[in-house]
Swiss-Prot record:
GO terms for cellular component: cytosol. NCBIfam families: rbfA. One of several proteins that assist in the late maturation steps of the functional core of the 30S ribosomal subunit. Associates with free 30S ribosomal subunits (but not with 30S subunits that are part of 70S ribosomes or polysomes). Required for efficient processing of 16S rRNA. May interact with the 5'-terminal helix region of 16S rRNA. The keyword Transmembrane helix does not apply. It comes from the Bacteria. InterPro entries: KH_dom-like_a/b, RbfA, RbfA_dom_sf, Ribosome-bd_factorA_CS. This is Ribosome-binding factor A.
Length: 136
């Protein structure tokens, strides 16, 4: 099975959907942040492993606690996944915190700060220009 095959893409989507449902409804671990979402899933072509990219809304401690909770719940999730999805092999789940959303938010804040600085500078230039027009 090729990495980008249609079948592999469908399996990735199905595993992501099933895990999202399981994490939100079945897990009762207090370490897992309720604002945890699965960003992407990459199931290996041999169906032995699956990298599960998660995003956790919160501070770094919350991310670490959520990751620890998910790692300890991985065998349970794998068993539930085997019941929910009919696959030849049920993949071993490897959870990875995805920083791309936080990176995007921080870049957006930086862009907004730069734009706000440009607006202030252009406002100051306009007021300076008006002052010079009054002198003429």
């Amino acid at each position: 099975m090729r990495k980008n095959s249609i079948k592999n893409t469908r399996i990735n989507q199905e595993v992501q959907k099933e895990l999202s449902m399981l994490i939100s409804r079945e897990l009762k671990d207090p370490r897992i942040n309720p604002m945890t979402s699965i960003v992407a899933v990459e199931v290996a072509p041999d169906l032995k492993t699956a990298k599960v990219y998660i995003s956790v809304l919160g501070d770094e401690l919350s991310q670490k606690n959520t990751l620890a909770g998910l790692k300890s719940a991985a065998p349970f999730l794998r068993g539930q996944l085997a019941r929910g999805i009919n696959l030849r092999n049920t993949p071993e789940l490897l959870f990875v915190v995805d920083q791309s959303i936080e990176y995007g938010v921080s870049m957006s804040k930086l862009i907004n700060e730069v734009n706000a600085g440009n607006h202030k500078a252009s406002d100051e230039e306009e007021s300076d220009d008006k002052g010079h027009e009054d002198e003429q």
